[in-house]
Amino acid sequence: MIEAFRLGVFSRGATLWDGLDFAFGDAAAWLVAGPPSSGKTLLLSILRGERRPDAGDVLVSGESLYRGNAALARAWRASCGHVPEQTIVDARLTVEDLFRRSALAGCGVRERERKDRADRLLGMVGLPGALGWRIAELSISERARTFLAAELLRGPKILFCDGVVAGAGIPCREMLWGLFRALARAGTTVILAERTIPERWASAAGDAEPVGPFRVYRLPVPGAAVKGEPG
């Protein structure tokens, strides 16, 4: 369980938001929708333990990320996967290089296993045979899906995705819908940050919880009772 209490952020002499409370249950898929410049990326960095809030605190399984044990906070950050909205990498890198880096960050995966898993993950996101491609030559959609697949190689317990649904594009929405819900069913906590939620996703998720400038949706997972599930 990730809980945030009375979160506040002050920027450029003004209050971006203050007094916000969040609760994200384990093994679930969540989507936080908010308008441009509302602080979605900043919120994810606070929840990951990367940026201390100006007010409030974040608790993981009842333990404070910012006022508690530093070792716990480091372990938490190591357990998190993160797909950023803006991806800046060496133009010379290939997709395989990206997976190699992910394997090292995940405490090491044998080369043969890494390649097999990378092939499967790329196939899952609609990019079979992409290991040799140069990242600089990928489209916006291909890049979003590639970085997502590379983070999944690590097997993170918590996956934060910033703008991945929008970046991947409309043709990939149903694939991502199934993937994120399957990850949640397998025990991964998925937290997505987007400007808007796809209409079919919103219909299936039901009423959102308003929190400051954000609306928080819990996506239904396979095996649970759902309404209006996208077809």
Question: Which role does the model predict for each range below?
Answer:
Residues 56-67:
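Conserved ABC transporter NBD signature motif
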